[in-house]
A protein has these predicted regions:
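DNA/chromatin major-groove-contacting recognition/catalytic segments
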Residues: 97-102, 153-158, 274, 295, ...
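C-terminal secondary-structure termini that scaffold catalytic or DNA-interacting sites
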Residues: 137-138, 152-167, 174-176, 196-197, ...
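Basic, Lys/Arg- and aromatic-enriched nucleic-acid-binding interface segment
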Residues: 46-54, 65-130, 136-138, 165-167
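N-terminal DNA-binding recognition helix of tyrosine site-specific recombinases/integrases
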Residues: 12-16, 23-39, 43-77, 121-123
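Conserved tyrosine-mediated DNA breakage-rejoining catalytic core shared by Y-recombinases
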Residues: 78-79, 95, 128-183
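Catalytic-site neighborhood detector that most strongly recognizes the C-terminal catalytic loop/helix
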Residues: 90, 148, 177, 285-310
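Short, basic (Lys/Arg/His-rich) helix/loop patches that form interaction surfaces
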Residues: 46, 101-106, 118, 170, ...
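Short, small-residue-biased leader/transition segments that mark boundaries at the very start
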Residues: 1-6
């Protein structure tokens, strides 16, 4: 939500701009000072580098427009830097099946079903109320009208969505409609995802919810044990199909990483694989910018050589000379 964006931008401003440059007057800052301030960001993600770069330029271009500076030190500072982000991969059909089988009787099941089969963002799922879930109509759908965020670990539900395009009505497939009907029949809350008192989840509650997934994965984990009064850091990588020592019922069944956002990415990817045109996918995903949808489209359409072979052969089939 917007509250989270504001909080992140304030943190970025304090950590990467105020800390290195805050003791200087605007007019004292040189291009070299700006470059030095950006050096630590070269080891961060390209997205963070770009954000801080933009914030710096906002400050100095605004000062220049207001005639507070004779010289703008940001002129000529490259907007490119940082490490490229990891490529997001959608879950395969086999991984989706295994994930759902693993969590079927566990608390995250409904959250995961909504993510996989409606593509809602985490903040939209956690803010979803039953008054926006329409199940007794010829075409069941979810109406996206609210967003969740937390302040001091307390949930705040607002009608301010991430973008204008995020406000939409999403038709849902039968498997999700059936799942939601079952949940609604026993729900004591106006929220689809709620705690035991019927309230929306706090940040720490959501993290605990997602831990049901993490602890069943084969992801390497760190723990500490005490030997002769000293704390020693140990690492362990669970074996697929193995069991947790303290809890034999817990099986390490997920041999892949999965994040909440990956559910949404999988939904979008599956629509594109099914041949849904990108403009419709843009609407269903609530993407304000078509570039976001087209980047995923390009990844889906062009990342498999075997799918492109016929196109390449057709392009170069005519004899030359």
């Amino acid at each position: 939500g917007l509250g989270d964006v504001y909080k992140r931008q304030t943190q970025n401003m304090n950590n990467y701009i105020v800390k290195p440059l805050g003791d200087m007057y605007l007019s004292e800052v040189t291009a070299d000072d700006i470059r030095l301030a950006l050096i630590p960001l070269s080891q961060k993600s390209a997205g963070l580098y770009s954000t801080v770069n933009m914030l710096l330029k906002c400050v100095f271009y605004s000062a220049e427009r207001n005639q507070l500076l004779d010289y703008n030190p940001c002129v000529g500072i490259s907007a490119k830097g940082g490490k490229p982000g990891k490529k997001k991969n959608a879950l395969t059909d086999e991984q989706v099946k295994l994930l759902l089988e693993t969590v079927r009787e566990l608390p995250p099941y409904v959250f995961i079903m909504i993510g996989l089969y409606s593509g809602l963002r985490r903040e939209e799922i956690l803010a979803l109320q039953w008054d926006c879930v329409f199940l007794d109509v010829p075409t069941p759908y979810i109406s996206v009208r609210r967003a969740w965020r937390t302040e001091h670990n307390r949930p705040v539900i607002s009608t301010t969505l991430k973008t204008k395009a995020a406000q939409m009505d999403i038709p849902i497939p039968k498997c999700l409609a059936d799942c939601l009907r079952q949940v609604k029949a026993t729900s004591i809350s106006e929220y689809v995802i709620a705690d035991s008192k019927g309230q929306p989840l706090a940040d720490s509650q959501f993290k605990r919810l997602w831990q049901y997934v993490v602890v069943r994965s084969t992801k390497e984990r760190t723990y500490y044990k005490y030997v002769n009064g000293q704390s020693i850091k140990c690492k362990v990588t669970p074996i697929p199909g193995g069991h947790q020592k303290n809890n034999p019922k817990l099986v390490y069944s997920l041999d892949f990483d999965v994040t909440p956002h990956q559910l949404r990415h999988t939904y979008i990817t599956n629509l594109l694989y099914a041949g849904v045109d990108p403009k419709t996918v843009q609407y269903l995903a609530g993407h304000e910018n078509s570039k976001t949808t087209m980047d995923i489209y390009a990844q889906v359409k062009y990342n498999k050589p075997e799918h492109l072979l016929s196109v390449v052969n057709a392009a170069f089939s005519a004899p030359v000379g």
